[in-house]
Amino acid sequence: FTIEDLLKHYLQKKFHILERLATIYDKLGVVMRKASKYEQALDYFTKAQNIIDINHIKNPELTSDIYNDMGVIYINLDIFDKALANYQKAREIRESVENPDLEQIAYSYHNIGTVYQRQKKYADAITWHKKALEIRQEIYPDNEPIIAASLTMIGNDYTQAAKNDSSYHFNDAFEYFAKGLEIRKLTLGETHPDTAWSYQSIGLWHFYQGEYEEAIENYLKCLSIRKTILQPSHAYTAEISYLLGEAYLKINQIHSAKEHLLLAEKIQASLHKVKALEKTQHLLKECSLS
């Protein structure tokens, strides 16, 4: 062996070890994210990204996954500009490889659409979510749960758009929700977290049209599922509890409203969800005045 051969072998081994370390950090970040420990998750993802960047490691799949995972954290922290930037970087990498993974590209499109939805840019949200749906319909059977995810998100887009823009109509949303829920109940079952999302979405659809009893009926189904399968302090449990409190307040059932809002407040405070906590505390004040 020449010195050059030994150096090359050393560098290859070094990069392999660093690549493995970045992968481990990324997986640890995912574990923290699933436990709603977003700051710890972001720390792990940042460590993974730094290893990739500093050492110029060429692994498009891993790099795009890290950017995507960071985007998930930022959207959960309501930092939408950073979420969008990371999702776009993941998309660019996934589209640029020699043999693009259409499934992963669809995920990027879906995630970008979700950021636009949260930013209330509904036309952009619909565009990106429909792009994701088109790809998924090409590569999956019609009753795949991933198809239901796209259908439900497009329903959400139309619901939010109709709430804020008179050029959209609530009826545009319902066919997407109904088909999405049908697929999820058939393939995932009644107690799956994605089925809970369908019930929450349909509940919101009713709420925005002033159909509060129907909203509560769907919200309660969602809450029942989440209490069964999620940790007690999960952000999604807080979210549906807030929505229930809001709906009960609309029909002047103050005791029920306060019960659910207090649960939401407790969870949001533990997760440092400042904006959500402010909204919950505002509704609690309304309960006190009623």
Annotate each PLM feature.
Residues F1-I3, Y38, F45, I52, ...:
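Hydrophobic/aromatic packing residues within the alpha-helices of TPR/SEL1-like helical repeat arrays
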Residues T2-Y10, V31, I51-I54, I93-V97, ...:
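Residue position in alpha-helical solenoids
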Residues L11-E19, H56-S64, D81, E98-A106, ...:
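Helix N-cap/loop-to-helix boundary motif
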Residues E19-K34, E61-N76, E103-R118, P145-Q160, ...:
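Conserved alpha-helical positions within TPR/SEL1-like repeat arrays
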Residues G29, H56, E98, G113, ...:
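Short coil/turn linking the two alpha-helices of tandem helical-hairpin repeats
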Residues I254-H272:
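TPR/TPR-like (Sel1-like) alpha-helical repeat modules
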